[in-house]
A protein has these predicted regions:
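Beta-propeller domains with acidic blade repeats across secreted/periplasmic ectodomains
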Residues: 1-191
């Protein structure tokens, strides 16, 4: 059998995630979320990459907590994740710093038609993997400390650090939703 291979683009750097939809290809390339139009779906770009969001930090000493995990939600928003060691202040290009959304480990989403971004939850260390159940509820994993979480918009989850929440009105940070840990809780998490 003949194998078909096509290179859509090789003009991006730091690619951590790819998602197709809404007339093109979406690329998470920290510090930016890029969109390359492909309106007819022929796997040939219809234009240059467009920066849709920016402000995702790139930690120099920790290459596993980058913004990642693009996935279309059942609500038509594009969802993504960002690790704790790569905090940022995200927004559409040109957004002044005081109007940007801080993210320090958490889940965010972007609406492609309205061109708005929301940070839904903070406090996770290294979120990798998320999906929706049959009721449209979002669940995600965290590869350090607690590992199964139910996304509740506005939540600040308990993570390994004791840093303050981005939201000054948070009463208490939420624990994981799994019924067990993936380390011996009688010891420190890294032993």
């Amino acid at each position: 059998p003949t194998l078909f291979r096509s290179v859509f683009t090789d003009e991006v750097q730091m690619l951590t995630s790819v998602e197709v939809g809404q007339g093109g290809v979406w690329l998470m390339c920290p510090p930016k979320l890029l969109f390359i139009p492909d309106r007819n779906g022929d796997l040939v770009p219809d234009g240059e990459p467009e920066v849709m969001l920016d402000g995702f930090d790139v930690a120099r000493g920790n290459y596993h907590n980058f913004a990642n995990g693009l996935r279309w939600g059942p609500d038509g928003w594009l969802y993504g994740r960002c690790g704790h060691s790569c905090p940022g202040r995200i927004g559409v290009p040109g957004t002044p710093d005081e109007l940007r959304y801080p993210i320090d480990g958490g889940i965010w989403r972007y609406h492609p038609k309205r061109k708005v971004v929301e940070v839904l939850a903070h406090g996770t260390v290294n979120p990798w993997g998320h999906d929706w159940d049959e009721h449209g509820e979002l669940f995600f994993i965290n590869t350090v400390i607690g590992h199964m979480w139910h996304l509740i918009p506005g939540a600040h989850y308990r993570e390994s650090g004791s840093g303050a929440s981005q939201n000054p009105l948070i009463y208490e940070r939420m624990s994981q939703h799994a019924d067990h840990f993936h380390f011996d809780t009688n010891l420190a998490w890294h032993k």
